Swiss-Prot record:
InterPro entries per record: Cys-tRNA-ligase, Cys-tRNA-synt_Ia_DALR, Cys-tRNA/MSH_ligase, CysS_C, Rossmann-like_a/b/a_fold, tRNA-synt_1_cat_dom, tRNAsynth_Ia_anticodon-bd
Annotated family: Belongs to the class-I aminoacyl-tRNA synthetase family.
Gene it is expressed from: cysS
Positions with a binding annotation for Zn(2+): C30, C214, H239, E243
Binding-site positions, ATP: K274
Aminoacyl-tRNA synthetase found in the keyword field: yes
Family annotation (SMART domains): DALR_2 (SM00840)
Protein name: Cysteine--tRNA ligase
Transmembrane segments: none
GO (cellular component) term, any one: cytosol
UniProt motif 'HIGH' region: location: 32-42
Keywords: Aminoacyl-tRNA synthetase, ATP-binding, Cytoplasm, Ligase, Metal-binding, Nucleotide-binding, Protein biosynthesis, Zinc
MF annotations from Gene Ontology: ATP binding; cysteine-tRNA ligase activity; zinc ion binding
């Protein structure tokens, strides 16, 4: 097993990772609420925790990876009504779109993708345990709420006391609650809501609150105490704080050993926001950029750092990834099994073992590319392909990548080949001015030509 230190949000420091069960890792990541297309922020969560999943496996662990799907909540009910369709029709469609986006980004499907609506009995069971322990109460409006002041550890993830939270956090005002920080476990049904959004319970018809969904699904699939829980930084409070209160309140055991949170996505140095009009779906981005470029761009930043999205940064990522593929295009590395005793691999593993430091790990890839360009080393090419593969990169044929690229270049492969043939004819006819003109025309269109021995010409997108 590779040595691994992870920044634990709960401890506010890097800590050695020691799995509860030797050689095995149980990991849960908060997934999508499926009522709309996935955006760039979702892409970061997908790719970051796919990277974590891949590295844990590469390090020799047997990983059970769970990422939930929220398929019932207020936004889903509202959107289905606006569209004139059932909740099931809406969520099934957007689950499919989510899977398509994740696959495009090279994300390995989690071992389990529980849907909230399939785990309502487990949620009701957990709520019943909380009520029996005096941690939950039914309010006058019919909702069942969690009493935060009854849980001694509330605030330990966010590092704030109840007084700090009451003073500084925006919480919903509700006269039926005993405390403004109390949160809903079971939402009482409204007459106007569709039947498919309601389940029977001893507290009356209703549906689960968002927070109880993750507690019930994670504990059901991974046990009441597991290794890693991840999600975006925006979920740290209140969602993850509330998960701890629910899960530890119900079981009386520690819930999660390591809490991981990826940083925010910023658009041109501003926070991504629909209200600012700087909100991009994954599908919009993939119209202009190859999906592997987007994955490379996300992994180029440390997962806890802010990620600044811009066309300029994506263009830089495209050029950088092109450098790596170019180094591999004339090599035949054969297999891609990594020699972990080799110096580059040791540096790569050391970086990944330091809280998944992908920027440093990726710098090792460029060192290998330089060695390949300098020496033509097949061993270096094999290391480059193998190490990059642990990040889900460089898994395609180099020529396929190099001749792909942006979909809005305005010049097709067929047009490129036609111009190359015309240039070859011009050279045979010793019309070198015309041959140079065609090369310049292609270069202006972002196409780089490389004349090979024997008269062949290869091309790639710049």
């Amino acid at each position: 097993m590779q040595l691994l230190n992870i920044y634990n949000t709960l401890a506010r420091e890097k800590q050695p990772f020691v799995p509860i069960e030797p050689g095995k890792v149980r990991m849960y990541v908060c997934g999508m609420t499926v009522y709309d297309y996935c955006h760039v922020g979702h892409a970061r969560v997908m790719v970051v925790f796919d990277m974590v999943h891949r590295w844990l496996r590469a390090a020799g662990y047997e990983v059970t990876y769970v990422q939930n799907i929220t398929d019932i909540d207020d936004k889903i009910i509202r959107r289905a009504a606006e569209n004139g369709e059932t909740i099931g029709e809406l969520t099934t469609r957007f689950i499919q779109y989510m899977h398509e986006d994740a696959a495009a980004l090279g994300v390995i499907r989690p071992d389990h993708e529980p849907r909230a609506t399939d785990y309502v009995p487990q949620m009701l069971d957990m709520i019943g345990k909380l009520e029996a322990k005096g941690l939950a109460y039914q309010a006058s409006d019919g909702d069942v709420n969690y009493s935060v002041r009854k849980f001694a550890g509330y605030g330990k993830l966010s590092g704030k006391s109840l007084e700090d939270l009451r003073a500084g956090e925006r919480v919903s005002a509700n006269d039926a609650k005993q405390d403004p920080l109390d949160f809903v476990l079971w939402k009482s049904a409204k007459a106007s809501e569709p039947p498919e959004s309601k389940w029977d319970s001893k507290w009356g018809a209703g549906r689960p609150g968002w927070h109880i969904e993750c507690s019930a699904m994670s504990c059901t699939l991974l046990g009441e105490h597991f290794d890693i829980h991840g999600g975006g930084a925006d979920l740290q409070f209140p969602h993850h704080e509330n998960e701890i209160a629910q899960s530890e309140g119900a079981s009386g055991k520690p819930f999660v050993n390591m809490w991981m949170h990826n940083g925010f996505v910023r658009i041109n140095d501003e926070k991504m926001s629909k209200s600012l009009g700087n909100f991009f779906t994954i599908r919009e981005v993939l119209k202009s950029y190859d999906a592997e470029v987007v994955r490379f761009f996300i992994l180029r930043a440390h997962y806890r750092s802010p990620l600044n999205y811009s066309d300029a940064h994506l263009d830089d990522a495209r050029h950088a990834l092109t450098r790596l593929y170019t180094a591999l295009k004339d090599s035949q590395p054969g297999g891609c099994a990594v020699d972990w005793d080799e110096p580059h691999a040791r540096r790569f593993a050391e970086a990944m073992g330091d809280d998944f430091n992908t920027p440093i790990a990726m710098s090792v890839l460029f060192d290998l590319a330089s060695e390949i360009n300098r020496t033509g080393s097949t061993a270096a090419a094999r290391q480059l392909k193998g190490l990059a593969g642990t990040l889900g990169l460089l898994e395609r044929d180099p020529h396929t990548f190099l001749q792909g690229g942006r979909s809005d270049d305005g010049i097709s492969p067929e047009q490129i080949e036609t111009l190359i043939a015309a240039r070859k004819t011009a050279k045979v006819e010793r019309n070198f001015a015309e041959a140079d003109r065609i090369r310049a025309q292609l270069l202006e269109a972002g196409i780089v030509l490389e004349d090979k021995p024997g008269g062949a010409t290869e091309w790639r997108r710049a």
